[in-house]
Regions:
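Short hydrophobic beta-strand element within catalytic cores of glycosyltransferases
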Residues: 328-331, 341, 345-348
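Donor nucleotide-sugar binding/catalytic pocket of nucleotide-sugar-dependent glycosyltransferases
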Residues: 128-169, 252
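Nucleotide-activated donor-binding/catalytic signature segment of Leloir-type glycosyltransferases, i.e.
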Residues: 234-298
Length: 534
């Protein structure tokens, strides 16, 4: 499961076990028919196999639909929630801030906050919530600094780990089971192969370690990469390993596509020989073909030191999975990583420099390679007793801080004490008189035109002078919509047409909500209700 999926499973299980709430899950990568064994209602976002082709075409027509944009309003119209909880990246859940049904439910969002400052468009979306939780103390600090006057930041609900699953094993025994020399040192990482994960710098640092470390540790030390390769937008790992001339010192995890067996082997590019089924069909793990959790625990336990080398993290779950297994971490001392380092007694890697990223306008970091090299040396030079003590220290600290029960209590404390506002929870309230004006008055400036759009077409007067509205004025003034990677012509007619569709959709949804029109029971809603009823 993804990190968000793991979070949802652990939170929902505890909310359900409390027997205090009626629950529904909007499962993004599930079909409703897959939810028959779940004890709460499950609405699937993925199209059913027997749905009409036009539904599947609609699903594929907008990238946001994979995150739920195309079905969210139908789900809340059917379930009529008092409160909606979300916990994903800003770009995944931002569509909820535009929902016509926003007045009828209390919304608590825990977005990932991986850098400072946050994008202004995200801040505006966050401001539509009733409360904000964060994955890390860094997130709380950043949002209060950037927009404390706009946001109700109520706390931190960091993920937990199951200490009965993520736990230390005898390292030599695990290595022998995996076919590894029990007496070597292994520096490892578990990161997806993405731009923000600094694989080239990690490989470069390891190469320098091999040059400057004392012979008694460098000769029997290896780098283990548990990652995906190749990735469409990821690093060319083979190139960087070859460039640094460390080919014989880098290990990788491989999973066989044919027999599904996995092993740790020397890095041999993206396709490798499987000794179990004797086919050339072993690949490096990915989201679609990964390891089961008990096997991932073995990967962590094979390591002496775990490294999270990234420009930023919204949390970085593998760090606490590693420390729960008694493996100390070294991580970039920035964003959520700085909190994880503090709570797990890890090794903070100094920041060499900060820079602004063009895509997000956020501060990102390059950690200090030389400092990482020194951390590697210092840790591997510890005596066996000192390593054992450090392992116990990081394990104890992790179990004390990252607990799923504590995580769920943060959410439950808020749910049990919040006060609904205005129409929240009043799904049977009388119809709201909504009317849009299609005829634009003549002689308006761009500023007046945008104000008219928000007041008379979108019916969102409170947003008429926000960031999005201000940007629309600017775009109209220059005749183009300008975002990172996007420069497209825009004019009043195009903007009016788009906003008229949104305004008319708002009126239709309000009619359905108030009983003046009927919501067609799509297959996914019918299956969700049937499964829950059974």
């Amino acid at each position: 499961a993804s990190g968000f999926g793991t979070y949802a499973k652990n939170l929902l299980e505890r909310l359900h076990a409390s027997d205090k709430y009626e629950l529904a899950e909007f499962a993004i990568y599930m079909k409703s028919s897959d939810g028959h064994d779940v004890p709460w209602k499950v609405y699937g976002n993925a199209p059913e196999d027997d749905e009409p082709d036009e539904h599947k075409q609609l699903y594929n027509s907008n990238p946001n639909n994979q995150f739920g944009a195309w079905r969210f309003d139908k789900v809340v119209l059917d379930f009529k929630p008092d409160i909606v909880l979300t916990y994903r990246d800003p770009w995944m859940d931002m569509f909820i801030s535009k929902s016509p049904l926003l007045p009828y439910f209390h919304w608590v969002w825990m977005p990932t906050v991986d850098s400072d400052p946050q994008k202004q468009s995200w801040i505006e979306g966050f401001s539509k919530t009733d409360a904000i939780l964060c994955y890390s103390e860094f997130g709380v600090k950043t949002l209060k600094k950037d927009a404390g006057h706009l946001l109700n930041v109520v706390g931190c609900a960091s993920p937990g780990i199951d200490p009965n699953i993520y736990k230390p094993y005898d390292k030599k025994q695990i290595r022998e089971e995996l076919g590894l020399d029990p007496n070597v040192n292994i520096i490892g990482t578990v990161m997806r192969n993405q731009k923000r994960k600094l694989f080239p710098e990690l490989i470069k640092s390891f190469a320098k370690f091999l040059k400057v470390a004392p012979p008694e540790i460098k000769d029997n030390t290896y780098l283990l990469l548990h990652t995906s390769y190749p990735e469409k937008m990821g690093w060319n790992l083979g190139y960087h390993i070859s460039e640094e001339e460390v080919g014989g010192k880098v290990l990788a995890t491989y999973v066989c596509k044919t027999c599904k067996r996995w092993r740790i082997d020397f890095f041999r590019d993206s396709l490798n020989y499987c000794p179990h089924c004797k086919t050339i069909s072993s690949v490096m793990p990915s989201v679609g073909l990964g390891l089961e959790v008990p096997d991932l625990v073995k990967v962590y336990n094979a390591m002496d030191l775990y490294v999270q080398y990234a420009i930023c993290e919204g949390f970085g779950m593998p760090q606490v999975e590693a420390t729960a297994c008694g493996v100390p971490i070294a991580s970039s001392n920035y964003s959520a990583m700085e909190d994880v380092l503090q709570w797990t007694k890890g090794y903070p890697i100094n920041i060499q420099k900060m820079y602004r990223e063009v895509e997000t306008n956020a501060e990102r970091v390059f950690p200090d390679n030389d400092h990482l090299v020194q951390i590697m040396i210092n840790h591997l030079m510890l005596s066996a007793e000192e390593k054992a003590n450090k392992s116990q220290e990081v394990r104890n600290a992790t179990v004390a801080r990252y607990d799923w029960d504590d995580c769920a209590k943060v959410w439950m404390n808020y749910i049990d004490t919040y006060q609904p506002k205005m129409l929240q929870g009043k799904w049977n309230s009388p119809p709201r008189p909504l009317q849009i004006h299609e005829k634009v008055p003549e002689g308006l400036t761009n500023e007046q035109f945008v104000e008219f759009i928000y007041n008379a077409v979108l019916l969102e007067p409170d947003s008429a002078f926000g960031y999005e509205a201000t940007k629309l004025v600017r775009d109209l003034n220059i005749g183009a919509q300008v975002d990172h990677g996007v420069i497209e012509p825009i004019d009043r007619n195009k903007l009016l047409e788009r906003c008229l569709n949104q305004g008319k959709n708002k009126i239709v949804i309000e009619k359905i909500r108030s009983g003046q029109a009927q919501l067609q029971e799509d297959i996914f809603i019918k299956r969700a209700n049937e499964n829950y009823g059974n």
